[in-house]
UniProtKB/Swiss-Prot annotation:
Reaction equations catalysed: [(1->4)-alpha-D-glucosyl](n) + ADP-alpha-D-glucose = [(1->4)-alpha-D-glucosyl](n+1) + ADP + H(+)
Similarity comment text for this entry: Belongs to the glycosyltransferase 1 family. Bacterial/plant glycogen synthase subfamily.
Superkingdom, taxonomy of origin: Bacteria
EC id: 2.4.1.21
NCBIfam families (UniProt xref): glgA, PRK00654.1-2, PRK14099.1
GO CC terms in record: cytosol
HAMAP family membership: Glycogen_synth (MF_00484)
Alphabetized UniProt keyword annotations: Glycogen biosynthesis, Glycosyltransferase, Transferase
GO molecular function: alpha-1,4-glucan glucosyltransferase (ADP-glucose donor) activity; alpha-1,4-glucan glucosyltransferase (UDP-glucose donor) activity
Origin species: Rhodopseudomonas palustris (strain HaA2)
Descriptive protein name: Glycogen synthase
Keyword Glycosyltransferase belongs to the record: yes
Gene: glgA
Taxon lineage: Bacteria, Pseudomonadati, Pseudomonadota, Alphaproteobacteria, Hyphomicrobiales
One GO biological process term: glycogen biosynthetic process
InterPro entries attached to this UniProt entry: Glyco_trans_1, GS/SS, Starch_synth_cat_dom
Amino acid sequence: MSALTALSIASEIFPLIKTGGLADVTGALPTALKPHGIAMRTLVPGYPAVLGGIENPQQVHSFADFFGGSARLLAARCDELELLVLDAPHLYVRPGNPYVGPDGKDWPDNALRFAALAQAGAAIGQGLLLGYAPDILHAHDWQTGLVPAYLAYSGRPAPKCVFTIHNLAYQGQFPYELLTRIGLPERAFSLDGVEYYGGIGYLKAGLQLADRITTVSPTYALEIQGPDAGMGLEGLLRLRADRLSGILNGIDTRVWDPTADELIPATYDIETIGARARNKQALQSRFGLRNAPDALLYGVISRLSWQKGLDMLLDVLPGMLAEGAQLALLGAGDTPLEQGFRAAALKYPGQVGAVIGYDEALAHQIQAGADALLVPSRFEPCGLTQLCALRYGAVPVVARVGGLADTVVDANEMAIATGVATGVQFSPVTAQMLAKALTKTAALHADHAAWRNLQINGMTTDVSWKNPAQHYARLYRELIDA
């Protein structure tokens, strides 16, 4: 097996900067690829959190004028990750998260900020750094969608480029007038280039021009070729269907390991799963819930948005609580949903607890202490929380969409009879069907043996990066050999 070098280009990476599952993927994939003979470095923006978290940064290139200011490339490490950091203070050193300011609005120069990241990635791929020539570029989501565009319109030899869609809903659409400012020629503004509904489509560019497209589950790869999930890009995705594949995400099973997790009160495995009771008690205390060992405790760890279906959860909450269930919710997002769950916590003291925000340690504690994890998403490219839930023995209750459908085995009669069920699915994705799923979950929870089987099946499911990394390694080698 010949050794390959790959450059991943991404707007976030765990553990340095994270707003969602993209960071978990880009943080775990390089390590997972090592056994396959692939050495992956990752190019990320020099946000303050990144610059403050890297080890031994060394300047390897400088730009006198790069998208409006001086910039430099730093080679650095973070734990096992090999990084290249685009240190451009005029673009990345600012408060807020990577995409929005403290006022909750997108940074007005996002088009330039992420064009810069993409252009730097393409340049590195084409030999910018002496002695480093990656065989493959791997770009992620709209923020790096221009990578294959810069390669395609450079007029120079270029490595193959894979583009991964983590969420088609975020598309990076900007006005045509920025074309020259981002360094693309007029000929790029065409239907088979970066043009999208009269503007520049960063995500569309990646889909149009990458050598291969992946998304993060087989079901989502099919869904996005239809009008319900295609978000206006289904026609292009159908045209490129022979270049599109779905590869499930994994999770970092060293970070998510109930046998050695330092963030939870009691560690456990399938032999000592009874220790989860201590975690449940601690979780109830943390969320101000009644100490009720037998109550069905649901956890939610989610962005609070329409996509995630949490408005439906508010609709069915009274019925769920009437059956004696409890809810521990961790998340942030749309103001009406934040207000709705805060109000529910006040209305149902002892039964509903809500922490608005994100807390990595608390996320681990929910997985380790909740009986079930709710993921009622209207669409879900892959989803990672349900994978963590499986690993931790929190039975996932999920909508039958995208990666949720691919990773959770519904507890229907056949699956229970054959001993393979790992959770509860519902479809179609409506409040009425969610309510039915909750009733079914309560019945399963009341049957101690059936519930324990669901937990053990989940905990013995392989949710690691082993299989996904194998698929990516095969894809890279197919591209190079083509």
